[in-house]
Amino acid sequence: LGDVYKRQSLDMQFWLDGGWGVDVLYGQQTRLHRDIDIDFDANYTDQLLDLLQERGYQIETNWLPTRVELYSKELGYIDIHPFVLNADGTSKQADLDGGWYEFQPDYFGTAVFEGRSIPCISAKGQQVFHSGYDLREKDIHDLSIIKQCITTMSLTIR
């Protein structure tokens, strides 16, 4: 997660997503992770790719404008997802068929992890992002953690 902290200095809006995003919401690591998923302002796609390649990452999968997966022997896998950000707080991501996924403002938030405030996909957003496909074992695990986060938030609000 050290790279996530460094990305905060890029002046680029981003959110931690995927399994690490779930664990950050929960406040601790609950499983092993193959990669780190970052959703970010699509206006910075070239700049982010240049930075990652300068740090030793090589492109493994290029499905732009939807996503790019990169790998570094020293740093592992990172999966970046360009989002078009709108002034009203909504956003969208290109899908593989030429359409768009549309996202509401409350899908984005922050959580404290290891004493730092980390921009991440909210529990509500994680539920949506974990739908529309056949769930793998790790997705089922992540959804159970998300449900625990939502239950804890509901108890705290009351």
Spans of model-derived segments:
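Conserved catalytic core of two-metal-ion nucleotidyltransferases
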Residues: 57-91
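Short, small-residue-biased leader/transition segments that mark boundaries at the very start
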Residues: 1-5
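Anion (oxyanion) recognition and catalysis
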Residues: 8, 53, 112
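Catalytic cores of NTP-dependent nucleotidyl/adenyl transfer enzymes across multiple folds
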Residues: 93-158
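Short amphipathic alpha-helices in soluble, non-transmembrane regions
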Residues: 48-54
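Active-site nucleotide-donor binding segment shared across nucleotidyl transfer reactions
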Residues: 6-36, 41-42, 47, 122
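Structured helix-beta-strand junction loops
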Residues: 10, 54-55, 149
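Short, solvent-exposed loop/turn segments at secondary-structure junctions
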Residues: 21-22, 85-87, 125-127
